[in-house]
Amino acid sequence: SGVGGISIVLEMRARMPALDILYLSDARFLPYGDRDEAFVLVRSLAAADFLVARGARALVVACNTATAAAVPALRARFDVPVIGVEPAVKPAALATRSGIVGILATASTLQSRRYADLLERFGGFARVIGQPCPGLVEQVEAGDFDGPDTRALLERHLAPLLAAGADTLVLGCTHYPFLRPLIEQLSGPEVCVVDPSGAVARRVQ
């Protein structure tokens, strides 16, 4: 909904430097994680209309909340590939050594049917704990990746996951890769941080 999708653009650019990319940021209405599903669906359809009208040959929904709310409708409406992004539950569940995975995401993503489906399919491999992270998107949008306020927010959001024994953390919002160095610092070297951005870029290839 804002600059979060740039984390995926950077991965795409690294793999496909000649690719023409149209990037649309709905900065007026961010964060989508605080919006209801119907609102996000309407905004996503409008954004896709804008991009397809300007020649987009594929749509990357570079937002977990918008993916959960809009990808089926987008695929039904447009004759171009639609690629979404969602929490990397499967690779995290297979990678964990402690058997406990933490998902850092917005409340909307954690409450979505799409996330529930992921848990049904892959949650049997590990105990998966969803942690809503209010405030983090706003910190990233403000360019505050490691200031005291961001650090305090992350410490609060990470504490229950680390206390539960999570050794694998999933970045379940496209804004959060910008906070990865701080997340890794606060979590310690024994905790693996999983970022799905690379997997999305590979699907575009």
Show where each model-derived region lies.
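Non-catalytic structural scaffold of enzyme domains
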Residues: 1-205
